[in-house]
Structures are given as C-alpha cells and as structure tokens.
UniProtKB/Swiss-Prot annotation:
One of its GO terms (cellular component) is ribosome. It comes from Reclinomonas americana. This is Large ribosomal subunit protein uL18m. It comes from the Eukaryota. It is found in: Mitochondrion.
Amino acid sequence: MDHKLYLRIKKTNQHLYAYVLYKGKQLVTVSTNQKIIRNDINKVNKKIYPEILGYLLSDKIKEFGFLNIYLKRTYLFHGKVKTIVDVLRKNGVVIY
C-alpha cells in the first residue's frame, strides 16, 4: 500500500474543486464554490479563475509543508487542469 499525497481535480459545469488526499482523506480542499472565490469570480474573466484556484491551493499546500504530490489523472491534461498544475509548479510544488 502506498502512502502518497494525491492531487485530485474535479470539474462540474459551474465549479472546480481541488483536493489533496492522503489515504483517502482530504487534507486540503479548495473550490470555486468557496465564499472567498465565489464573490470574485463574477468580476473576473472565467479563464482566470483556475489560476486563482491554483494560487490558493499552493498557499494551503505550503502551510501544511507538502512539497511532492502525485496528480490523479481523471481528466485530460489540458485547459483548466493544466492551468492549475502549472500554477502549482510555478509556486514550488513538485507534481509527478
């Protein structure tokens, strides 16, 4: 049994969710449905909110001290998923 940290990104028609999982438990959760982001989404271009989500997720990941995370590939690696992962990598999180 491997005990790795996994990044899972879930997309719905209206929102994005990003979780960091360890042994099936959520350690860090960020979504566009959170009050902080939801109020600002209407004011910005919808192409920017995956970046906002990535910056918030990287801040929370750094608070916990996680540096190496494996990506659970549930979606194709392009578009919003790629944007979130690129922002995480730019902020120093190593994604495998």
